[in-house]
Swiss-Prot record:
Compositional bias per record (Polar residues), positions renumbered to this chain: 182-192
Region span, Disordered: 168-192
InterPro entries tied to this protein: Homeodomain-like_sf (IPR009057), Winged_HTH_dom (IPR025959)
Protein name per Swiss-Prot or TrEMBL: Uncharacterized protein y4pG/y4sC
Family: To A.xylinum IS1268 ORFA.
Keywords: Plasmid, Transposable element
Signal peptide: none
Keyword Metal-binding: no
Bridged cysteine pairs (disulfide): none
Length: 192
């Protein structure tokens, strides 16, 4: 069995408790208090009990604390996947979207995401999903534009004949025209 990983020398239990009081991150405070118990000479099993974790996790906290100090005990955000397009490829994509497709060359009259997926593969040999292309376009400042939907059998010449020409006529109701009936209990009742 290996020996325990030692904590760094530039902190002590009191300093870690002070940092735990000042932090606004509850997880960091719990980890600092667990490490303070180790600094005070307590066994690592007590630190695991204080942190409500296993000994392996306490060891991971010690390694993170030794490497980056108290900031190493804050949960970091996962970096996520690497972008498929580099800056030059993004600029080429923006340029081709702004200039629009050439029907004789690209075979389309307007860019759709699936057409851009095909263009990116032909130009850069990078396979992308349509949603990823949409995310890239949004990051470049482009927005999806769509025409107002129309019925396929709509006759544009007869649209004016069906438009409402007069404004609605509003009249005031007579006073007391809708007097609600009440029951013996005071609530409204239905008409028979």
């Amino acid at each position: 069995m290996g020996s325990a990983v030692l904590l760094r020398d530039d902190f002590d239990g009191a300093a870690l408790r002070q940092l735990a009081r000042q932090t606004k991150d509850a997880n960091q405070a719990r980890r600092l208090l667990a490490l303070a118990a180790i600094y005070d000479g307590g066994p690592r099993s007590d630190a695991a009990r204080i942190g409500s974790v296993t000994l392996q996790i306490v060891r991971d906290w010690v390694l993170r604390f030794n490497a980056r100090g108290p900031d190493g005990l804050v949960n970091g955000k996962a970096p996520g996947g690497r972008a498929k397009l580099n800056a030059a490829q993004r600029q080429a994509l923006a340029k081709v979207v702004e200039s629009g497709p050439i029907p004789a060359i690209h075979g389309v009259v307007r860019w759709r995401r699936k057409d851009l997926v095909q263009w990116i593969f032909q130009e850069f040999r990078i396979s992308m999903d349509e949603t990823t292309v949409g995310r890239e376009l949004k990051a470049l400042g482009f927005a999806k534009l769509s025409a107002r939907p129309r019925h396929y059998a709509q006759n544009e010449l007869e649209v004016d004949a069906f438009k409402k020409t007069s404004p609605p006529l509003w009249r005031k109701s007579e006073a007391g025209s809708r007097k609600a009936r009440t029951s013996n209990s005071g609530g409204p009742t239905k008409r028979a």
